[in-house]
Amino acid sequence: MGKKRKRKKRSIAIDVKVIYQRGMQLYLEEENNFAGLKYLLRAAKAGYKKAYGEIGIILHREKNEADEAEEWFKKAEKTDSLFPSAAYEYGMLIYFKKGDIESSLNYLFQSAKQGCELAYGDIGTILYLEKNEINEALEWFKKAEEADCLFAPAAYYYGLLLVVEKGEWSQSLKYLQKAAREGYEMAYGELGSVLYLEKAEIDEAEKWFKKAEDAGCLHAPHAYDYGMLLIKERGDIERGNRYLDKAAEDGY
């Protein structure tokens, strides 16, 4: 009788693992978030700890259910099963939804130290924007680039850091172009300014100023530079003054 009970327990454990694996297959390979989540919740309710963090990731990333996702991340942490990519996702949730910089960085550092390369660029961005730790931010941006995971938002802030903090206009161009070409709209105006002021590439600069305006993100400094380009390079004083006025109205 004892042996039969043991075999039954092992069979249940195997079944739960199969349920978890099917959930991950549905989510990652078949891109069926709803069905994948359903299987993972079944596995989690049966006590399969590996599912906790995955549920948190799906709820946050795919369904934007931050509070429920946080409950699953906390559950994973309490059971010592918060794996690196879940720690990363939890850190980003805390940053964007809770505004808790220190707690966010704690989880991002935890994930990065365990090899989650996705965290590198975001750590650099937060250190730069929120803590003004320029040199440390620079190191994390470099780590992200070396790991081939410097994605558009981090590339933009890396380029911005190089312009604003280091005065390295030429070097910044590479990162601003990367961010802009990958569709990060915040980069458009900055790229236009660098191309105009540093490279004197008038046509290319104007193209990016126009893209920034079309995207509704032509901010005051770039509006000013666009206005000056129109006046000095195109002789279009009327249009140029409109952009200078916009920059002035926005406090530039």
Where are these regions (language model features)?
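Short helix-capping/linker turns of helical repeat alpha-solenoids
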Residues: 14, 46-49, 79-83, 114-117, ...
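Residue-level recognition of tetratricopeptide repeat
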Residues: 24-25, 57-58, 92-93, 125-126, ...
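Alpha-helical segment of the N-proximal tetratricopeptide repeat
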Residues: 14-42, 46, 57-60
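TPR alpha-solenoid repeat register
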Residues: 18, 51-52, 86, 119-120, ...
